Amino acid sequence: MQQRHLNRRQYFCELANTARTFYMEYLNTYIKLTPDTRVLEIGCGEGGNLLPFAEKGCQVTGIDICQSRIIEAQTFFTECHQQGTFICQDFLLTEEPKTEDERYDLILVHDVIEHIEPSNKRDFLLHIKHFFKQDGIAFFGFPAWQNPFGGHQQISVGPASKLPFIHLLPKPLYKVLLKTSGATTSKIGELMSIRVSRMTVEGFEQLVSEVGYNICKSTLWLINPHYKQKFHISPRRQWTFFASIPYLRNFYTT
């Protein structure tokens, strides 16, 4: 496990830096950020992605199912002298806004969809639609399942946390490798859950089409923007030819 997964303040700052440097510029074509802009992040964790939006004066709200992450988000925002509303709740159980003013201009769903159980993904996306303003947009980001660390094995410990593609091994062999590397039963359970909930580029495109979303922009990354914080290497978009190869592109899209 990388130190950044243990030091949550460092993790918060890294997410904020990536959002500030890349995500806000990426979204700039589609939304103008003002003090009236309402931003919701589903699965906000410590709130790092939301910090740059708060710094711009936006009204930010984060929802996460993990109480400790919500407490950390509140603490870190206070330390940064920024305002934010953070709610501990399962998003699928969150009550729909009753008025247009309560809805959101921008909804962030970053590194979340691959954790949603397959049977709940459709309901999850449909529920999100109730939170949009009439001209609202969503920003989705996720690692393609077959990419070198698409199984999130980096959050484990020992040699297995550094081995690419091991999540594609047969399940029994993968579990043995995690266990012999020192992973706890709960961590193995978490990684097995991600294995079940996996997300591919094609699966996502089909799912959002079925529930009536319009994709206004899609970018596949060979080296995704957050790798600059994680590994100090510059982002690189996927080459057009390789990005256009269905299924195979999941193996080299991060």
Q: Could you say what each language-model-derived stretch is?
A:
Residues 117, 132-133:
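Helix-to-beta-strand junctions that scaffold the AdoMet/dcAdoMet cofactor pocket
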